[in-house]
């Protein structure tokens, strides 16, 4: 089989993964694959393990791979906090190898106790007791691998445990739905009335497609409806967006909560948690919990009667 692609893999500290992935995507003109793992980068026993992300990109032939590697190496060396875990690795792939290689990075992901996110080519896997969400990687709107999404899903799972007849009455809002993953999870966990909104029309199209793929389109309404035009009485509101946006939207979010309802806020860096908590302090809310995953935080509030 004739080689048609160079595969380049870099190991970088997890906190730099997004920066490096964006750079490699721009440089290669193709998508990138990011895989998180723990690697002991040092031999002394008293030095802790570092969280490492393995980022893989692809260059189509013909190309001057030596020049590309020099650019990558120079970019990495200039990053603050970059500690080389291993030099970039290069291999040649044929067309069929490339098609299967990127898929190898994406496997079913179990979240919490009752959810399983799987790409479409892995749908044969069923975990007993888990609701299966089918989402393919590569979309720009989220597939569940990021800490912010996982925290939201774990918190949501803990809330959607009443008897089925009670779940049917729960009205849910997914604010900034992206791929629709949170709304789909809510439907898979038994909710029947879900509004999924996003300011990006393309995100709404993707969310609608994913709802149809997961056979929950009859439970979820996807739209670009602005927050101020939505109704109220939501028992659960999910918002996985930037901390500053959460604070700006706080009055509109809280006013749409039902008394006793839950609010799940994610997309919050640890250093921004105080900003968000201060922004929601003036409202009639009870702070329930702060969940942590790496540098990210997810906050759970309840609306006071």
Swiss-Prot record:
It is found in: Cytoplasm. S-adenosyl-L-methionine binds at residues 149, 176, 198, 240. GO terms for molecular function: protein-lysine N-methyltransferase activity. It catalyses: L-lysyl-[protein] + 3 S-adenosyl-L-methionine = N(6),N(6),N(6)-trimethyl-L-lysyl-[protein] + 3 S-adenosyl-L-homocysteine + 3 H(+). It is an enzyme of class 2 (transferase). Its EC number is 2.1.1.-. GO terms for biological process: methylation. The keyword DNA repair does not apply. Gene3D superfamilies: Vaccinia Virus protein VP39. Signal peptide: none annotated. Its main location: cytoplasm. One of its GO terms (cellular component) is cytoplasm. Methylates ribosomal protein L11. Belongs to the methyltransferase superfamily. PrmA family. HAMAP family: Methyltr_PrmA. NCBIfam families: prmA. This is Ribosomal protein L11 methyltransferase. It comes from Trichlorobacter lovleyi (strain ATCC BAA-1151 / DSM 17278 / SZ) (Geobacter lovleyi).
């Amino acid at each position: 089989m004739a080689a048609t692609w160079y595969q380049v893999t870099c190991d970088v500290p997890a906190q730099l993964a997004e920066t490096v992935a964006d750079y490699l995507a721009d440089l290669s003109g193709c998508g990138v694959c990011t895989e998180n793992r723990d690697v002991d980068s040092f031999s002394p026993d008293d030095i802790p393990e570092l969280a490492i992300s393995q980022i893989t990109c692809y260059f189509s032939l013909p190309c001057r791979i030596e020049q590309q590697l020099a650019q990558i190496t120079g970019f990495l060396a200039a990053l603050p906090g970059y500690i080389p875990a291993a030099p970039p690795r290069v291999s040649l792939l044929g067309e069929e190898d490339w098609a299967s290689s990127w898929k190898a990075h994406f496997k079913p992901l179990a979240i919490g106790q009752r959810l399983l996110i799987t790409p479409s080519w892995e749908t044969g896997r069923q975990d007993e007791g888990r609701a299966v969400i089918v989402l393919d990687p590569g979309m720009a709107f989220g597939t569940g691998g990021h800490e912010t999404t996982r925290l939201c899903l774990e918190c949501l799972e803990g809330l959607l445990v009443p008897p089925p007849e009670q779940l049917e009455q729960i009205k849910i809002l997914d604010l900034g739905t992206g791929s629709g993953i949170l709304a789909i999870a809510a439907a898979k966990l038994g909710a029947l009335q879900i509004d999924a909104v996003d300011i990006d029309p393309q995100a709404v199209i993707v969310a609608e497609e994913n709802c149809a793929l997961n056979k929950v389109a009859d439970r979820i309404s996807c739209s670009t409806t602005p927050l101020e035009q939505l109704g109220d009485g939501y028992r659960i509101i999910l918002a996985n967006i930037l901390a500053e946006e959460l604070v700006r939207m706080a009055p509109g979010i809280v006013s749409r909560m039902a008394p006793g309802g839950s609010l799940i806020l994610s997309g919050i860096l640890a250093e921004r948690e105080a900003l968000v908590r201060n922004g929601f302090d003036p409202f009639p809310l009870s702070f329930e919990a702060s969940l942590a995953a790496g540098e990210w935080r997810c906050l759970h509030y309840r609306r006071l009667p």
